[in-house]
Amino acid sequence: MDDARARRDGRAQARWEGLELMKTTPWGFRDILPEEAQAREEIAQTVAGCFKSHGYLPVETPLLEDKSSLDRGGRITDTPFKLFDDDGRLLVVRPDNTLPIVRLVSTRLRDAALPLRLRYEAPLVRAQPRNSGAARQFTQLGFELIGEGGDAGDVEMVSLVIESLQALGLTSWRIVFGSVRPFMELLARCGDASLSSDVLSLVHANNLVDLDTRLAQSSIGEPLRRAISELPRLHGGIEALDRVDELAVLAGIEEPLTGELRALVQRLEQRFTKAGEGAGAAPDAAGAQAGKAGSTLSSSEAPFGLDGALSFDFSIMNSFDYYTGLVLKVYAGNLPDPVGTGGRYDSAFDGVFPELDRVPAAGFAFSLERLEGACTASEDARDASADHAVARAMEEPLRIAVPKGSLNAGTIAALEAVGLDVSGLRDPGRHLIIHARDLRGEVAGGEISEGGTTAGSETEGEGASASARLAGPSIGDVEFIIVRATDAPAFVAGGGADCGFCGRDSLIEADLGLLELVDMHYGACRFIEAEPAGRAGAADRAYARRGCLRVATKYPRIASAWYESRGIAADIVTLHGNIELGPIVGMTDRIVDITATGTTLRENDLVITGELMECTARFFVNPGRARLDARVRMLADRLAAYAAVRGQRG
């Protein structure tokens, strides 16, 4: 009896030890517990019910897809999981649900009657920066409308999105429209395939600063260069569409490029106004705050249509390049990440259906995880609205990440120059958050100078109010959060700040898809490769012998990309300080580091062997906040004017 019990106990212990090894999930993946799973189920059923009521039929596709077939459908870059099957085919765990449905329709439903209305609920995985807190697996609730083009298809797609948001009871949402067509028309006039590829990659990466640098290096004419540079910066209401068409004319394009967007908004307004529904949406907290008297946006800057629930932003370039026209992102719950994305992809089925050269198609997908977060945020907002004091506290100031260290003085000078109160930043003590305000309502001017003064004259009339004397709208209250420059991108990406400042290097290393808007022209330094002067040639000999270089750096992503671009194999050793010691003590062959004056290199007897890039401070924003809160763009415009003065003066 005792022996049998001992054997059972031994087996139980072995099973427990096995479970101990499985007690955590891989990074970027997590378990869903019953309470959350039930909430997700209810959301999924509600959304699926909306899709089903409009005749959308369910389909399912495999989790694994042949990579070559997906590549033929569009640009696929964020596929973290790849494997070979027994036949030697390269398979991927799908990062997208639209392309598998394109494959399904192309192979199994070619003879189906059009239009096809399909829906799905399916998980997918996408690459994310390690230790960023971002999930690598999420579930999409989506639909595809195949065979219905033009205004009718666009209106059906967007209307179904609106109905789904209403069915979920979301009281605060925003739909932001863009279009791929204007940008592609401009690129078609470049006549330079390499330039077009580089420009498209930079816009996909939200890097508008390097976009300007690349355009300046090109030989295209000034009107076209200006149009390409300005287009992804355009945002707002109908006036943004007017400016798109103006830029097109300047670039030699006579046909208006915004007709589809104008028609879409007009039909949506007619449909929902006629139905007596309105949008069912109140402007989100940022929009509501921006609409308060005295400190607000002009009518041209405020969101328009469906009670402020619609706007345009031509920086929207969805991550997959199969889109051909309308693209859109949906925000809800005043959260910075979109709860859904979609658009039109009219070329995906070219030649697929008999006797039809082109079959239009459009689709949209909600993120179940983000919808659940938005629903929770909306419920919290409704509960808080019952308490007036709590509701007032929820009107948050614009939050700006201010770096410590070498960029601190330049950042304070820039913020002061554009009219913000920086007195608390000069000696913050141990405070991590500094409360401040925009001083524009307290001065009579508005013309920005490099030195931080404001010039101008008071409007006529002794009784003119402060708001009447403003050269532009006030940003209102702000909060400065004091962070390390290397941490600023994480705070902005994670919603801890709306915007911030850091070096170009920190943005590259973080790789969080933030929107880079302004080169601030301070904090200049160079990225260099260096080695000990007394061992000149040793690194080359070691490379010839080993086939790789050993390199110490604090910037592994930048260093790896540079060596890869030169076809050099390099083993990167990541250090966090005293990088120069790597080759001095014989741990590495060379270093990759920053230098401003070269003093540290000389003092440690290091000589430069390569130049990687130049680096300056940049103003960057959370893309969602830039689309939801016009104060972010207002600050960016002021900073751009200030930086332009600095750039002109060298």
Regions found by a protein language model. Give the residues of each.
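Beta-rich nucleic-acid/ligand-interaction surfaces
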Residues: T61-D78, G178-A188, I316-T324, E580-L581, ...
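Acidic, His- and aromatic-enriched active-site or binding-groove loops in soluble protein domains
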Residues: T79-D87, D192-D212
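Positively charged, Gly/Ser-enriched RNA/tRNA-binding surfaces
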Residues: E36-H54, E65-S68, I76, T98-D111, ...
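Polyanion/phosphate-binding surface patch
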Residues: V59-L91, A134, F527
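Intrinsically disordered, low-complexity terminal tails and inter-domain linkers enriched
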Residues: D3-E17, T273-F304, S378-A393, R437-I475
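Auxiliary tRNA-acceptor-end handling modules of aminoacyl-tRNA synthetases
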Residues: G18-E36
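Short, glycine/charge-rich beta-strand/loop segments that flank catalytic centers
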Residues: T61-S68, L116-A127, R174-E185, E509
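Domain-level signature for soluble enzymes in the chorismate/prephenate branch of the shikimate pathway
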Residues: G294, H388-G650
